[in-house]
Amino acid sequence: MAFGLTGAAYLNIDVMVKSAGTKLKQARVLSSRISFRGPVFSVTTDEVEEPGGVRARRDVIRHSGSIVVLAVDDQASHDPDNHDLAIVDSAKAARKAEPRILLERQYRHAAQSMMWELPAGRIDDGETSLTAAKRELLEETGYSARQWKRILHFYVSPGFLDETMTIYLARGLQAGEAQPEPDEKIATRFFALSEAKRMALNGRIRDAKTISGILWLAQTARAAR
């Protein structure tokens, strides 16, 4: 069978799904202890009884959650040589109408490489996700935005991490001065949506939250046409 599952395994999964939906919606935590505590996250070691009666030890990274900013420049580009779009050919005008996405490039030690990413950061204690999004965009890029909309909310890696990410769409951008943290060395650049989508699909962009945001915008733009 697919994925090497036997009929019994399929039956067991079906029982777990049914029990999760009707009898046991969450695991019963039998014991929990903090096995690591750091400035950004902690780790708990939990003894649990999960849906279907499975008992297991789970090490879970605990995180306060993060935000991601999909900052879009809809006034993509005025032509420095000719501001009269009425006399520009239709293909050039179409290119001008394409939105641009603000990306950051920085070194990521865990990935051992430079990465293109959307602006993002952790939600501090006492902050709302929107407040954190506005703060991170300004700190990392120097931009502020007049329009904000929450578009996506998801778990990063729910097998061992409880962190969620919320992506905000930011429009009406206004340039300012970046205020990065001392250990942040960030370069920023605008990419046309079509180019950013190619980068997401050909592997040049390898960051999951960034790929999610870019493909959301590409799909939304396509549906609006």
Where are the language model's segments positioned?
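Acidic pyrophosphate-coordinating catalytic loop
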Residues: 34-37, 109, 154-164, 222
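Acidic, metal-coordinating catalytic segment for phosphate/diphosphate chemistry
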Residues: 31-75
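Long hydrophobic alpha-helical segments typical of transmembrane helices together
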Residues: 197-225
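N-terminal amphipathic/basic-hydrophobic helices that include classical n-h-c signal peptides
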Residues: 1-15
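Extreme N-terminal tail/first-helix region
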Residues: 12-37
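Conserved Nudix-box catalytic region and its N-terminal flanking loop in Nudix hydrolases
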Residues: 23-24, 58-61, 79-135, 139, ...
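Unchanged
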Residues: 56, 67-68, 96, 122-208
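Conserved hydrophobic/aromatic beta-strand scaffold that supports enzyme active sites
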Residues: 40-47, 103, 167-169, 188-190
